[in-house]
């Protein structure tokens, strides 16, 4: 098992997948020789993993009245590893939340479409304030830099990187 860790039956995990990169799974049994898991894609089938295959713990999905709960900041994730980060970004992307914090850094995903209301005047006004917002948005990043100049007389830098 990864790092000689033992896993209990029912443990929610991520396993490598050829097409999807990572796939959600649940441990059926685990011992020193093999780990048997089941997945939503193959509920009747079982996948047998070698003990040295990469496995990452997964948190139970949280649902609210609006649907799947998606964290505004990746540092709030219970497990901070590649599959958890990619899943969180995908879940946010699926509901048109293209901005996500990772600590003080803003991650922006290309939505490949127009998202109505994303840059409206009302949205802009909601970020123009002396109080910092906790919502991830490019307007928030701009306002924080502006406030740093005006309130603290400190030089500010906004680094933009992408393809």
Predicted regions and their residues:
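N-terminal entry segment of cytoskeletal motor ATPase domains
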Residues: 1-161
């Amino acid at each position: 098992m990864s790092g000689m860790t033992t896993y209990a039956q029912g443990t929610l995990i991520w396993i490598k997948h050829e097409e999807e990169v990572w796939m959600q799974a649940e441990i059926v049994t685990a011992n020193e020789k093999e780990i048997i898991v089941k997945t939503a894609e193959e509920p009747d089938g079982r996948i047998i993993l070698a003990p040295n295959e990469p496995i990452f713990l997964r948190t139970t999905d949280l649902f609210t009245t609006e649907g799947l709960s998606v964290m505004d900041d990746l540092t709030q994730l219970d497990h901070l590893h590649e599959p958890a980060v990619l899943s969180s970004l995908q879940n946010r992307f699926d509901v048109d939340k293209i901005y996500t914090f990772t600590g003080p850094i803003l991650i922006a995903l290309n939505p490949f479409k127009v998202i109505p209301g994303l840059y409206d005047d009302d949205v802009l006004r909601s970020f123009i304030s002396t109080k910092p917002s906790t919502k991830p948005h490019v307007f928030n990043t701009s306002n924080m830099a502006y406030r740093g100049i005006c309130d603290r007389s400190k030089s500010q830098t906004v680094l933009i990187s992408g393809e």
